[in-house]
Amino acid sequence: MEPLLTFSGVELYYDQVYALRNVSLEVNEGETVALIGANGAGKTSILRAITGLRKIRSGQIRFRGQRIDGRPPDELVKMGIAMVPEGRRSFPLMSVKDNLLMGAFTRHDKAEVARTLEAVLARFPRLRERYGQAAGTMSGGEQQMLVIGRALMSRPTLLLLDEPSLGIAPKLVQDIARSIVAINRDEKVSVLLVEQNSRIALKISARAYALSTGAVALSGRSAELLNDERVKKLYLGGEL
């Protein structure tokens, strides 16, 4: 079976400085794949290349067999790709309800949108509790739940997550991690997870790619990488 997402020899530059060097990777249907590495390793650049926020210089990006490099972001949403950016970018003055509905901007069947909204609220009960509250008044963890829920409102096939644990209290990090596992398992949504907390990323993903200075340094099954001495030394801060 053809992979859902394929990167083939992708190179990306910021001005004359390379961000990605000959990167090749795959995400299969129903799979969670993690991208780990230090700041500046190229993890977020991969997501920006997928979503069209950065134009690649060479290589190909395919989704369901179709080339998507160069396509506008709204077209990618319609194709089934949703992005949760780093930094919990909610609309702070808008209510939780209106933030969620913004995620369904490409959908026109009101009944289906209402069903999706109810499913999102069932998955994140805190959002139901704060349904009429301004998003900017919620905690960081609650806002992260909100932007994940907003992405799910588009009914994606592939969910891109950029540093979902960043700046969140430890208990809520675990809640977010469990939510990612449940979304993948229950809704059959494929997930490409960028996460600097490599330990959590490897525990909730099936496979992973470790990046260094814009290139893939290591890849494999996440369970195996968790016990790889090179990964422990470079990405996990020593022994688990």
Question: What are these language model-derived features?
Answer:
Residues 15, 33, 55, 71, ...:
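ABC-type ATPase nucleotide-binding domains, specifically the catalytic core motifs of the NBD
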Residues 36-38:
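The feature captures the beta-strand-to-loop junction immediately N-terminal to the Walker
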Residues 51:
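Helix-to-loop junction immediately C-terminal to a conserved catalytic motif
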Residues 59-68, 79, 112-117:
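Conserved ABC transporter NBD signature motif
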Residues 151-152:
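ABC ATPase C-loop
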Residues 155:
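Conserved catalytic motifs of ABC-family nucleotide-binding domains
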Residues 174-188:
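Helical segment within the ABC ATPase nucleotide-binding domain
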